[in-house]
Amino acid sequence: LTLELGELVSEATGQQSLSLTLTNRTEIGCFLYGYPGVSLLDSSGRLLPLNYRWSGDQMITSNKPTHVDVRPRSAAYVTINKYRCDLGNVAHATLLRVIPPDDTNRLELELPADSRSLDYCGTGDPGSDLHISPVEPTFPATLLH
């Protein structure tokens, strides 16, 4: 699997979402079931101490995980979301790590400058909760409907 940025998300006020695409680059199909492990790191490689939550919110679906078949050269989707930092950022995310469900290999993606809003706001700030969708067969399925 490879990790890439997905489609742009039409966000509610104050929300900062990032959609992700997990593409099967092999000639053999596979399946995914569950939530990916997600972590955001700063430019020094330090883990941002966000509250990483496998749950829905104002943008992310609350649906339970389903079995997702990923055919050769096809993709599965994940979206992450957090609220903005109203009182300022404590640390900036520059790297995203994803571990697909039932896997131990991590996939990494450098975050473009315009997605650096995925920052750590500080202890107790509502913007320090990062919500993670389950793996879904389509991008729209990762979002709250």
Listing of model-derived features with the role each one plays in the protein:
Residues L1-A12:
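Low-complexity, acidic Ser/Thr/Pro/Gly-rich terminal tails and inter-domain linkers that flank the onset
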Residues A12-S19, A91-A93:
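Short, solvent-exposed loop/turn segments enriched in Ser/Thr/Gly
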Residues L20-E27:
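Asparagine-centered strand-capping/turn motif at beta-strand->loop junctions
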Residues L32-P72:
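The feature marks short-to-medium sequence segments in extracytoplasmic or secretory-pathway proteins
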Residues Q58-A93:
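Short, solvent-exposed, Trp/other aromatic-anchored flexible loops in extracytoplasmic proteins
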Residues R84-P112:
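Short, surface-exposed ligand- or partner-binding patches at beta-edge/loop junctions that are enriched
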Residues E108-H145:
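Acidic, serine/threonine- and proline-rich intrinsically disordered appendage/tail regions
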